[in-house]
């Protein structure tokens, strides 16, 4: 079995994670006590991807929960599905990281990290063939960003050949929870560029917009936002868990989506968008799904794909549908919007079809795109970072935990390099002369010296 080990860190990560597990439990017919009450053999066929079967016939999740304060975990534990986590897999401190990346990465988090790694090791040893790790965290706070990236780099050392997928919630453009978000996010991206294989970029503001505009919710709660995220998360892994006509896994996804190793930050979308209470009453068709899925208003991060070009994209359909129709729709999208795809990667949209739809829907689709427009997001965070860093504002909180200013400078330049790499490939064309390329190579050689 190709198991996937789920790790959630910090308040945001734990809340998203809890929602995600509700969705997965519903899909596999697992009730809040961990017993199977479903109606289809297929639900049990590959249940091992996310669950361990305990001796008494109960299913226990392959999940590790960590935080530097007990609050969020207590609410997860007392939540509707809190009973199916292994009690030993809750690892928490008492002091909190206080939105300080350095506390999460160097001081408080570093003290707790070994206990987290012990749990991760124990879970990994329980797997027949571990495919990889998925980490939920936010980049604006202290624990999810600081300790989350610390854990990712430690896991990277210990399991270098396993896939590392992150669901990372970026700071929003207009809505800010904490002043030091730009610092925390930039320091985290600096780590993610090096240590993650695939990062799904999420953003509260874009999720709010979807709730207002598409779902017509007047006062969306974090619960509604997390519901959207969990639908996408479940879509990304559905091929591991259910049989399909065209399968994919985390590794195939990476091979098809990442043309250059540093450019592994993806935009995600989901269709059909329905609010939590209302199941949609109209039957959906593949063309409708495709249209909604590629719609820029559907993207869960605050970047507009129309401002850049897609390097690659992947569409994951779920439900009973004809693969021929899926292929036709995909070709159709690429032909109609050819200017939004780079022409130097032919056939750059991968599609997968999984037979089992999500609970309560006849068909659904998840979209993952590697678009150069995501640089808007990095650029925005980078500008805010520079504005504060020039004045050395709030820096004493970080240096007081033993950080060096040099690390900030490195993180800043790494983020700026990332932005310019995206820009470079956005502007690249297929028929540039080899002569130009040689010139560029020479420039790079001089640059590196």
UniProtKB/Swiss-Prot annotation:
Q: Where is the composition biased (Acidic residues)?
A: 429-443
Q: Where are the transmembrane segments?
A: none
Kindly list the positions annotated as binding GTP.
Answer: 11, 69, 138, 142-144, 204, 226
A cellular component term (GO) from this record?
Answer: microtubule
Gene Ontology molecular functions: GTP binding; GTPase activity; metal ion binding; structural constituent of cytoskeleton
**Record carries keyword Zinc:** no
Q: Which residues are listed for Mg(2+) binding in this entry?
A: 69
Q: Which Pfam families match?
A: Tubulin, Tubulin_C
Cofactor(s) listed: Mg(2+)
Single GO biological process annotation from the record = mitotic cell cycle
Q: Where is this region: Disordered?
A: 426-449
- Places the protein is found: Cytoplasm, Cytoskeleton
Kindly indicate where the leader peptide sits in this chain: none
Function text: Tubulin is the major constituent of microtubules, a cylinder consisting of laterally associated linear protofilaments composed of alpha- and beta-tubulin heterodimers. Microtubules grow by the addition of GTP-tubulin dimers to the microtubule end, where a stabilizing cap forms. Below the cap, tubulin dimers are in GDP-bound state, owing to GTPase activity of alpha-tubulin.
Q: How does it assemble?
A: Dimer of alpha and beta chains. A typical microtubule is a hollow water-filled tube with an outer diameter of 25 nm and an inner diameter of 15 nM. Alpha-beta heterodimers associate head-to-tail to form protofilaments running lengthwise along the microtubule wall with the beta-tubulin subunit facing the microtubule plus end conferring a structural polarity. Microtubules usually have 13 protofilaments but different protofilament numbers can be found in some organisms and specialized cells.
Q: What is this protein called?
A: Tubulin beta-2 chain
This protein's gene is called TUBB2
